Amino acid sequence: MIQAAKIIGTGLATTGLIGAGVGIGVVFGALILGVARNPSLRGLLFSYAILGFAFSEATGLFALMMAFLLLYVA
């Protein structure tokens, strides 16, 4: 019974990865639109996009870490 609860909790914790995937898509979609509108700002926009990617990926990694903690530690 406890093992089933761990597996269900792990599955629910991994839903945070959905938000990270959507966030990364939004960041790079905005980068493409921004470069298409003003190509001279490509370097600046790319650095902002990498920063946004890192923050989005960090939230996804936190969700994955919580899932592993629920599965193997709790």
From Swiss-Prot:
Transmembrane residue ranges: 16-36, 50-70
GO (cellular component) term, any one: proton-transporting two-sector ATPase complex, proton-transporting domain
Xref: InterPro entries: ATP_synth_F0_csu (IPR000454), ATP_synth_F0_csu_DDCD_BS (IPR020537), ATP_synth_F0_csu_sf (IPR038662), ATPase_proteolipid_c-like_dom (IPR002379), F/V-ATP_Csub_sf (IPR035921)
GO terms for biological process, alphabetical: proton motive force-driven ATP synthesis
N-terminal signal peptide: none
Location(s), subcellular: Mitochondrion membrane
Site (Reversibly protonated during proton transport): E57
Keyword RNA-binding: no
Topology in the lipid bilayer: Multi-pass membrane protein
Chief localisation class: mitochondrion
Highest taxon listed in the record's lineage: Eukaryota
One Pfam family matching this protein: ATP-synt_C
GO molecular function terms attached to this record: lipid binding; proton transmembrane transporter activity
Entry keyword set: CF(0), Hydrogen ion transport, Ion transport, Lipid-binding, Membrane, Mitochondrion, Transmembrane, Transmembrane helix, Transport
Family per similarity comment: Belongs to the ATPase C chain family.
Role according to the record: Mitochondrial membrane ATP synthase (F(1)F(0) ATP synthase or Complex V) produces ATP from ADP in the presence of a proton gradient across the membrane which is generated by electron transport complexes of the respiratory chain. F-type ATPases consist of two structural domains, F(1) - containing the extramembraneous catalytic core and F(0) - containing the membrane proton channel, linked together by a central stalk and a peripheral stalk. During catalysis, ATP synthesis in the catalytic domain of F(1) is coupled via a rotary mechanism of the central stalk subunits to proton translocation.
Record-linked PANTHER family: ATP SYNTHASE LIPID-BINDING PROTEIN, MITOCHONDRIAL, ATPASE PROTEIN 9
HAMAP family for the chain: ATP_synth_c_bact
Subunit structure: F-type ATPases have 2 components, CF(1) - the catalytic core - and CF(0) - the membrane proton channel. CF(1) has five subunits: alpha(3), beta(3), gamma(1), delta(1), epsilon(1). CF(0) has three main subunits: a, b and c.
Protein name: ATP synthase subunit 9, mitochondrial
Lineage: Eukaryota, Fungi, Dikarya, Ascomycota, Pezizomycotina
Gene: ATP9
